[in-house]
Amino acid sequence: MLLLNLLVIALLGCAASKEARPLAGTEQIPPAETPVGIATTQGVQTAPTADTPISSTKPAASSTTRNAGNDSSAKDPPITVPSVKGRTKKDSLALVKAVRFGAENPNWPVKTATQLPGAILPGHRIIAFYGNPLSKRMGILGELPPDQMLARFDKEIAAWTRADPSTPVQPALHLIAVVAQGSPGRDGKYRMRMTDSLIEMVSSWAAKRNALLFLDVQVGKSTVQEEVPRLIPFLKRPNVHLAIDPEFSMKPRMDRRQGVVVTAKPGARIGTMSSDDVNYAIRLLSDLVKQNNLPPKVLVVHRFTHDMLTGASKIRLDPRVQVVIDMDGWGQPWLKYDSYRAYVEAEPVQFTGFKLFYHNDTKKGDPLLTPGEVLLLNPKPLYIQYQ
């Protein structure tokens, strides 16, 4: 088994000159023929602490937004922190800050064109199980046998229906269809494409629950432009949607110490995508909708650091494509709330998502956030993913 030095825990409570730097750790990576997947490196967060300004995450065109980091000496008015049963005061404070930050940002809700027929959002909330059947480590989708997985899925769907009866739940299975790898493979792209037969298998599971199917792309050293078109035969189906994961998009960068351009392999550092990458995916999906008379597609973009998505204000919305920025970092409740505030609320795009990790979120003894606790956020996430 290969070992990669991974970033796993954010340094908390320190002043951020650029970003708080996580501590180093190690995790085991499967051999090249086995998908590495998000479970091996996922959840590295550099969210500010509750008392740290978020200067690097100021939303575009929102100079009137309070506490976006323009003035690090500015003080919040006193807050009465509500008691959230079973949570610490730190958790509650982070929640209050996230709720207030979203409420005071004049760019929420995002103004968009008239909704097209068949659009899923905002009239529904998508609840998704994430992973890959080839690995138990990459998420709940592959952790349990299909029947057990779907039974657990049913329970989560019921819980969200009870928590918010006013917003119908739309079930979804979220398959990592292109999986980042720790080794280069034959073409040196550090990614593995899943077979059509595997995608069809998960599609058959989704059909049992009248669920959507999301195809998630971790490009490694490839590109969105190279990987997504291969999925077009599936994306032509009305119930199939797309997700792209900047964490595993390993673009060339200048190593200032060595004075050379380098491209890290997946897991060695957190990757990045630009608005150009997102806009390409939007255009491709929009063309498919138009050419095939399909209902609007949903595009999920994962994010848990500022630099994972650059130029968010330049993302060009299209009524044929509904864009979700999904906060997919793991950790204690306060860190997840802070990350949602800093990396999703601070740069409004269109709709928001929130990821829950059955294992990583509970490592330190914290119970998994409940639907009711997630729904306290403002804006309320309309895409919920379980890993």
Regions found by a protein language model. Give the residues of each.
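Substrate-binding surface in catalytic domains of secreted glycosidases
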Residues: P246-L294
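A cross-family glycoside hydrolase active-site/sugar-binding cleft signature
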Residues: Y130, A172-I176, F214-Q218, A243-D245, ...
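Bacterial N-terminal signal peptides
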Residues: L2-L11
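Substrate-binding cleft of extracellular glycoside hydrolase catalytic domains
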Residues: A159-A163, P168-E247
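Aromatic-lined carbohydrate-recognition surfaces of secreted/lumenal glycan-active proteins
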Residues: V219-V224, K290-M308
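Active-site-proximal loop/turn and secondary-structure-junction residues that shape catalytic pockets
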Residues: P133-S135, A177-V179, V219-K221, P246-M250, ...
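Alpha/beta catalytic barrel-like cores
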Residues: C14-T195, S313, L317-V323, W334-Q387
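Loop/turn elements at helix/coil->beta-strand transitions in domains of secreted/extracellular proteins
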Residues: P168-V169, A207-L212, R237-H241, N293-V298, ...
